[in-house]
Amino acid sequence: MTTPTLDLAIITGLSGAGRSTAAKCLEDLGWFVVDNLPPELLSTMAELGRRSGGAISRIAVVVDVRGRPFFSDLRAAIAALDARGMHPRMLFLEASDDALIRRFEHVRRPHPLQRDERVVDGIGRERILLAELRGEADLVLDTTDLNVHELRSKIDAAFGQPNANRLNATVVSFGYKYGLPLDADLVADCRFLPNPHWVEALRPFTGRDPQVRDYVLAQPGAQDFLDQYSALLRLVGEGYAREGKRYLTLAVGCTGGKHRSVAIAEQLGIRLAAGGVGVRVVHRDLGRE
């Protein structure tokens, strides 16, 4: 049996340069992130990933190597991984002295290496300690002029997978008489459309059945609603993507959650999928009556 491929990343760099933010970005991309792992445990962590049967395929480790022993341990750990055919990528984060000073002043915390001196002294000391490690990094990111979203974009480009940035939407149909979905980001009300419940021939069927679907979609305003709401969702989706939000729950409601909301939710799912959105359609209250 083929052993699943394991992707390893090491996140390190200057204090205040964005290691924690980078770790959160990788976590959002589906990486298994371990913070402040001693370098000598890297091989153990990698072995756990290999034995997971593919459940853990990407591991990112945040390593603090300000001390010389830790630096030596990290180099030895990387060499051991290389010898076993596992080649971790190293991301090194840095920023200008001015940017780092502003960040430490903003959080009102001392630099870990400043001792009884100024923040800038601690930064300088750390630069010297990590200079050799910086030269061995696969990717060096200067975060001086980057906001969180720009840093996320760069990490996405370097460590993401195809479709990693794709918006994923769950479209939930529901009945108002059973209450709103608590996790909904956006709610659409389909009760402006005539209710098939009052058409005796349609009452036993649901919005997934062709006769009900065709009836709902043929009503005045149904197609206009789908066109305009889909356009709105594209606009909102682009904004969410820029903000790093990749999961969206869209609720579509009617009185009982059987006819109109089901038909409209199905159509919204089709339109969103055609626009490149990952879609899952759920009919919360179907069969509840």
Swiss-Prot record:
Superkingdom of this protein's organism: Bacteria
Sequence positions that bind ATP: 13-20
InterPro entries for this protein: P-loop_NTPase, RapZ-like, RapZ-like_N, RapZ_C
Family affiliation: Belongs to the RapZ-like family.
Function: Displays ATPase and GTPase activities.
PANTHER family documented for this protein: RNASE ADAPTER PROTEIN RAPZ (PTHR30448:SF0)
Listed name of the protein: Nucleotide-binding protein Francci3_1634
UniProt source species: Frankia casuarinae (strain DSM 45818 / CECT 9043 / HFP020203 / CcI3)
